[in-house]
Amino acid sequence: MKILFATSEAHPLIKTGGLADVSGSLPDAYYHLKHKVRMVLPAYGDVWEKVSDVKQLSELSIGACGRKLHVRIHAASAEGIDIPIWLVDIPELFHRPGNPYLALDGKDWWDNGERFAVFSKVVAEIAMNRAGLKWQPDLVQSNDWQTGLVPALLTLESVRPKTVFTIHNMAYAGLFPKSLFEGLELPWKWWEPDRGIEFYNNMSMLKAGIQMADRVTTVSPSYAKEITFPEYAYGLEGVLIRRLDEGHLIGILNGIDQDLWNPKTDPFIDHHYSADKGRVVAKKRNKKEMLDFWDLPKSVIDSDDPVVGLVGRLVPQKGIDLVLDVLPELIEQTNARFIMVGTGDSLFEYHLTELAHQYPQRVMIYIGYSESLAHKVEAGADLFLMPSRFEPCGLNQLYSLAYGTPPIVHSTGGLSDTVVNATKENLVAGKATGFVFYDPSRHALKSTILHALHLFSKKRTWQKLQKNGMQQDFSWTRSAKQYLALFKAIV
């Protein structure tokens, strides 16, 4: 099968969030399963220094907002990506400082709607083999609002590739004024709320993808159900319920990059291990090296007392307020230590830093993000804390399972789909992989942490729990096979 994967970011070329991680791994997994794949993304200024073997393939003109834009399409390759990359080069839209969506002052680029609408038009031309590339896909997979117009534009063609639109985060709807809709000369039949892309007198590029793709996917089965409820749908529950009822909204779990996140080979840790070899000793050694980062006394570093780690954004969505509520009591009532790595709301940063000053041998804080430290925490902590209020898929709990660090998670989205709660029944059945609480409250979080710390003292049970998690398959190959089964059903 020939697959065109359209995205606004891809690791390691350009990254602002989880979409880049998916784009950097999933298309490669299709390729390794013997499919012909091309990835297309905008040629941002920062991308040029990360690609090699650049060759111009074609030129074309795209009309939008009363002007004609000259477009060059380049082929390129990049370390870490195995498939051909097609860069859509429109200097006046994409050669800018800042990140793909924000100017240097942190505000959205004023013309983001035009930028990504034009990019989507180019993708549609490529898909229809009208871009001078002499290649036409059987299927186009587009991602989030930035490429939401691609499936819509392709519905205007009598014979076309099939389309799959993947939602990574419903929070970003790609809302733009009616004047952009008019400037793009889109069909007026689309300017209505039920089957079109109008949303409270704006156009929504996210809604365009949801309405008009042949199939809609999102990044976990539970999130696919959750986004049909108002609290997760941001006003789009009507169209999402319809797509779900049609059988056209499907959740497929993300995978993890096992070249980057693998305790057998991780370059950021000194003591490697696997589910069956060296796990107990290596985890203890990695724990000591992790604690040594904070220059703690030797007696604290050498202690077997449990360490609970957290790596993530310090924002309400991630449940950090719940963590702050329960930490003082847990410090008083248990022997656990807590390591927090992240950045976010200044108030959360302040309160966590205050706790670290108050309990310097029990609470260790790193404000910021460090790739090296994130790996060390996954390998060195005994438990990983992820109390997110909502989480479309989540990656850190998958890393934790892979590293034998049982996660404590709130039952939402991908967290529900990936962590098997350590109930009596699941422990007896040998299925448990972590700890789940079902109400995002301080009481539920605290009691779950206490349950986890109790099980930590039962070494045989704990080692079985670790091993169960490490034996789960969260590879991109597994994810890709599920996507490909969907693709084959509609092509």
Task: Mark where each language-model region is.
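Catalytic cores of nucleotide-sugar-dependent glycosyltransferases that transfer UDP/GDP/TDP-activated
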Residues: 1-491
